[in-house]
């Protein structure tokens, strides 16, 4: 996989995250915990825009981001999908441990232990993945691009 093809994959993921978020927005009022469903909608759209921006930078601006870094970024986008989908499930589960502020507003009593674990692991993985991906992006742009000597 080249940096260019990986960047296109990131762009497609970003576009799909936004699309899924927009469609999911139609479902939000029909879930047991609409406030938690709204959180999933926001995660899809916001993270989709984040990956669109990341991919656009990689495709349009000179940089020194390598193939390995792009692979890490692709892992981060897959972890982001897992996190956003865990929030979709949470609109029915009503877990409270990982997102206590949203849960306090939504009023759930908590999910089963396995549900709480899925939501927790998905959020931790995506959070760490996003931090690493953006750190690699920053480093790749701070280094001088090959044509800038």
Across the structure, where does each feature detected by a protein language model lie?
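N-proximal short alpha-helices
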Residues: 9, 16-18, 54, 104-111, ...
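Eukaryotic low-complexity, intrinsically disordered regulatory segments enriched in serine, proline
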Residues: 87-107, 120-124
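Individual transmembrane alpha-helices with interfacial aromatic-anchor signatures
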Residues: 109-130
């Amino acid at each position: 996989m080249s940096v260019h093809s990986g960047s296109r994959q990131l762009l497609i993921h970003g576009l799909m995250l936004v699309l899924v978020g927009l469609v999911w927005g139609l479902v939000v009022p029909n879930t047991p915990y609409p406030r938690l469903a709204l959180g999933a909608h926001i995660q899809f759209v916001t993270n989709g825009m984040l990956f669109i921006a990341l991919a656009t930078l990689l495709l349009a601006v000179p940089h020194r981001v390598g193939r390995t870094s792009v692979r890490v970024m692709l892992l981060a986008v897959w972890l982001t999908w897992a996190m956003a989908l865990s929030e979709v499930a949470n609109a029915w589960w009503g877990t409270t441990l990982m997102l206590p502020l949203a849960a306090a507003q939504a009023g759930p009593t908590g999910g089963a232990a396995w549900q709480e674990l899925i939501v927790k692991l998905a959020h931790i993985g995506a959070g760490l993945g996003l931090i690493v991906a953006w750190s690699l992006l920053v480093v790749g742009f701070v280094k001088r691009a090959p044509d800038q000597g």
